[in-house]
Structure formats: C-alpha cells, structure tokens
C-alpha cells in the first residue's frame, strides 16, 4: 500500500506542537510563533498560510500529522481536499484498509482516508464541493451545504463510514451525490451496498454505493468516452455512465 505521505519523513517526525507549518510542496519553513496544531485547512488559512499547497493537519491528535492538499483559491479558499484525481497515476481500485487509512500523495492523486474524514466531520460542520473537468477542458461543480461521515456512530467503521449530504447547489454538474446519502462505503473486499452483486467490483472502484451509483469518482481512469458501462470516473448527471472524467476534486470547508 502506498502511504499517504508527501513531505520528508524526517520533517513529519519532527513536527511537534511548536514546529513551523510547512508551506506547499516545497517544504519552506516559515518563522512563526507557536501555533495551535491545525485541524483542517480552515485553521491553516487562519494562521496566515493562504497559498495552495500541501500542509499538515492533525485530525486525530498531535502525534499523527496528516499531509493534505489545501485549496486556498477556489471561492475564497480554505478547502481541505480529501479526493483528487487528474492523470490516472494512482490506482483507486483498492481494498477496505486503504480507503480507511488513505493512500497516494497529497501533491498528486490521493485519498485522505475515511477515518480522517470522519474525525474531521465529527468535530466541525462542513460543506462539500465537488469539482469536475472533462477531456475537452469543460468544468463544472456541485456543492452540498452539509457533509458528514457517520456523525452519530459509536464506531464509524462498524457504521460503514456512512455518507450524509444535503443542501445541493448546482454549479453545472447536476446532483449525482444526494442519491448516495445514507449509504455505507463499499470496496471490493467489503461489500456494504444494497445490490445483490458487488457494486465496487462491478464499478471498478469504491464509493458509497447504493445499487449501484450515479457518482463513481473512484472508478477506473478511462480517459473520456468508454464502451464499458459505469466503471469509469463517472458523474452521471453531467456526463452519463459512458464518460470517464479527466479531473476530480472532493473537498470540504467549515460551514
């Protein structure tokens, strides 16, 4: 499994409570006074770091720094990106443990991890933005005023990291995600959807499948139009089930 790392391991291990924040993928250490460890990109923005790039956040406490890409530009910034795809360099057809803990590199394609996402939404209220781009360079987005992962569960994993979204706002992409609200997350090795077959295997990905999907943003990177049904990076309400998108970002910001 690829670890969800981008910054040098030595820097990660030395990042104590008073360590300077690391700005962008360059790893420039700025001289700052001792700051509270950031939970998310909202905190990082508030601390004065307002450039797009990779930063460290601490959703599970001070001993576990997590690299994350912060979008500080789009619509006022402060977005914590938890899913990013743009070139097919990272396989997203993975098992449960990878999706639970995260994989890829925060300066490239990556998945932040279901447990990290749960811990974030347990502590704050978030909105969600989904940015999409096709191979003809058309862009669209969808926004949701409320986003959370198993907010009331004693054990989020036993609850299946259930998705809750509401308050759709159209940015040209249409609503392909509300259909999935209330569903548990499924991978090919942990089938928790409502279909008699394995939706993750059929869709070549992992998602909050129902039976099966209108959104499949973790599907195969197929490079535009494809003959196979619904197993690419699909957002059905924008491009249907036979078009795999070029770029996707799923990101959250405090509401």
Curated annotation (Swiss-Prot):
Domain Fibrinogen C-terminal: 32-255
Any Gene Ontology biological process: cell adhesion
GO terms for cellular component: collagen-containing extracellular matrix; elastic fiber; extracellular space
UniProt keyword annotations, A-Z: Calcium, Cell adhesion, Extracellular matrix, Glycoprotein, Secreted, Signal
SUPFAM superfamilies: Fibrinogen C-terminal domain-like
Signal peptide extent: 1-20
Motif Cell attachment site: where in chain: 26-28
Residues linked to a glycan: 87, 137
Transmembrane segments: none
Predominant localisation class: secreted
Cellular location(s): Secreted, Extracellular space, Extracellular matrix
A Pfam family it matches: Fibrinogen_C
PROSITE patterns xref list: FIBRINOGEN_C_2 (PS51406)
Protein origin, superkingdom: Eukaryota
InterPro entries: Fibrinogen-like_C (IPR036056), Fibrinogen_a/b/g_C_1 (IPR014716), Fibrinogen_a/b/g_C_dom (IPR002181), Fibrinogen_C-term_domain (IPR050373)
Subunit description: Homodimer. Can also form higher oligomers. Interacts with FBN1, FBN2 and LOX. Interacts with COL1A1 in a Ca (2+)-dependent manner. Interacts with ELN in a Ca (2+)-dependent manner; this interaction promotes ELN self-assembly.
Function: Could be involved in calcium-dependent cell adhesion or intercellular interactions. May contribute to the elastic fiber assembly and/or maintenance.
Identification of the protein by name: Microfibril-associated glycoprotein 4
Source species: Bos taurus (Bovine)
